[in-house]
């Protein structure tokens, strides 16, 4: 499944209609990560704090806007909710909201915290720690969650680089890389 950004993904400014409106990303970048993480975390708990901290970790309004372009939690959540059950690592009977949503969020939210070129493998222990902090009621053990976290990380990494991304999807006769 190739990710094509369409008109609905342009985050139009509600006043001007211009694409690329990320008032949260821009404001968060300007205010700083700590305040943003705390504010969003108060609403969304540990998972909200993770996402808010990732967006706020990049200092400055312009950098915050760039982070907002790469990580739009609404777009990521919709994408993964539509895709998770088609992946090679999907476990029958596990649902998106409880089991997989926190895993994808660990991947995409944490990617923004590291410099370009940082690999998943080089920060895997940090990601595992983050998983245990935000997993909530997810039934996924680290080894199972790791694949979804990697997909969230890799998709965000590709979006930052302006590249297309395809997760590992099931095929009719087995499994194949996406």
What function would you assign to each model-found segment?
Residues 1-178:
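Intrinsically disordered, low-complexity, hydrophilic segments
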